């Protein structure tokens, strides 16, 4: 979430100075600051296409003024994206069927791979052979989408390897998953959590909003058992696959919303999706939450404040502060970290570790 409503904070020092004052009622110790390189850090990029005089350009549009900006290069994007952009544009310009009613493109990279998604306002079945030729000729994992349709050429799944405390963690996911878009900062976030856990007495972990297992796989060795919840079926399937990739056997995944889990733990409702999981067998010493921008609702706060230790990863300092007003009634902020996920922008990612008072 952007801090632009509070000021034009672009550098990490400026963001740090603001956050220090903004959270002073909860935390007065030193913040840990994690920097990012200022170019080629972002692994995801979305662009529009602009058509003029029978040719094609990458473009961005100002959401307020609707003014268009022709884009030739994205210095914040991963090097693989930057290298591929002109090759793709040149190919599309030479194929009238491919460029007709083409309105957008999404690039996604990992350390090893790249995938491209083309977005159309027409039936993509009519250009299936052209799309297949594009994928083969440019040696690219290609996805094409139009209303109600999706075509995949080669594969839509990407593989990723993260380096965490001298360990390699292996993942597979696709561009429908929520992905931390700055891999180096993602590794620093996970490592920060691991370093805290190294100093802690640990039993079992409860993780909400686990996605495809980004944190889960790296944290599992610190605990006897892990219960991780997520509402997306495809994310759960990737998380299970990622357990196999890492030979991890102590994680139990449940396709439940946080509100549903709260009802299940309080024994107010039974869920068929929990038929193979005995909640009474868990002794949670830690809970990890990485919620969407809206933060945690009251039912989730009421659930997690029962546990001794809370790790809160936040993409929105505003809702984080609101949630800390509730959590500070039972817990104290012990550690606060700032991650410069999007360099030279007002965006800031926060990590907070709380323990019971």
Swiss-Prot record:
Protein name: tRNA/tmRNA (uracil-C(5))-methyltransferase
Reaction catalysis annotation: uridine(54) in tRNA + S-adenosyl-L-methionine = 5-methyluridine(54) in tRNA + S-adenosyl-L-homocysteine + H(+); uridine(341) in tmRNA + S-adenosyl-L-methionine = 5-methyluridine(341) in tmRNA + S-adenosyl-L-homocysteine + H(+)
Biological processes per GO annotation: methylation; tRNA processing
Transmembrane segments: none
UniProt keyword terms in alphabetical order: Methyltransferase, S-adenosyl-L-methionine, Transferase, tRNA processing
Coiled-coil regions, chain positions: none
GO terms assigned for molecular function: rRNA binding; tRNA (uracil(54)-C5)-methyltransferase activity, S-adenosyl methionine-dependent; tRNA binding
Keyword Lipoprotein: no
Described function: Dual-specificity methyltransferase that catalyzes the formation of 5-methyluridine at position 54 (m5U54) in all tRNAs, and that of position 341 (m5U341) in tmRNA (transfer-mRNA).
Active site per UniProt: 315, 349
Transferase is among the record's keywords: yes
Residues engaged in binding S-adenosyl-L-methionine: 180, 209, 214, 230, 290
Family annotation (InterPro entries): MeTrfase_TrmA_AS, SAM-dependent_MTases_sf, TrmA_MeTrfase, U5_MeTrfase_fam
Homology family: Belongs to the class I-like SAM-binding methyltransferase superfamily. RNA M5U methyltransferase family. TrmA subfamily.
HAMAP family (alphabetical): RNA_methyltr_TrmA
Single GO cellular component term: cytosol
EC numbers on record: 2.1.1.-, 2.1.1.35
Source taxonomy: Bacteria, Pseudomonadati, Campylobacterota, Epsilonproteobacteria, Campylobacterales
